[in-house]
C-alpha cells in the first residue's frame, strides 16, 4: 500500500501545516492511474526490462489494481483522511494514449494545433474531474514530460494561442458543470503564459 499512503502520510506526520497535496499523475509515457481514455504507465511496454525505478512504479500500480483498488483513489482518500486537499496535476505537454504519436511536437507534429490532441487532453481532464474526488486540477505547462514540454512548434505560439485559450475555457465549463467547489490552477506566475507564447489564463473567465 506504500504507493497510496506513503507520500500523504509522510507530509501529514511532519506536522508542518501542510494542507494541500499536489500530485503529478502523468509523464510523457503514461498516467499513474487506470485511465479509461488515456494510457496507464507501463501498459505499452515491459518496464521490467528498463530502469529498476520504472519496474517499481509499474509493480506498485498493478499490486493495487490486482486487489481491486484504484491507485489514484487510494491516494486521494488518504490525503482527505489526513485533512489535506488533493490537487491532480497534469502535464499539458504529455498526451499518453492518444494513439497517434506523430501528432506531438516531439515527433514532428503540431501538438495542440491538431483537434485530436485537444480532444484527448480534454477527455483526460474531464475524467479526473468527474470520476475522482479531487479538490482541484493543475494544468502544468512547465514540466517537460520525457524531454518535450512544447504545446506548439517553436515560433507558432502567438498564432495558435487562441486554441489553448479555448481548451482552458472548455476545462472551466467542465468544472462548473460538476458542481461543488473545484479549483483550477493554470500557471504559477503571470509571466509564464507570455514566456510560452500562450494566452491561457483568460480561458478561466
Descriptions of predicted regions:
Residues 1, 44-81, 86-131, 198-202:
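Active-site-adjacent "subsite" loops/lids of carbohydrate-active enzymes
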Residues 116-205:
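Active-site neighborhood of glycoside hydrolase catalytic domains
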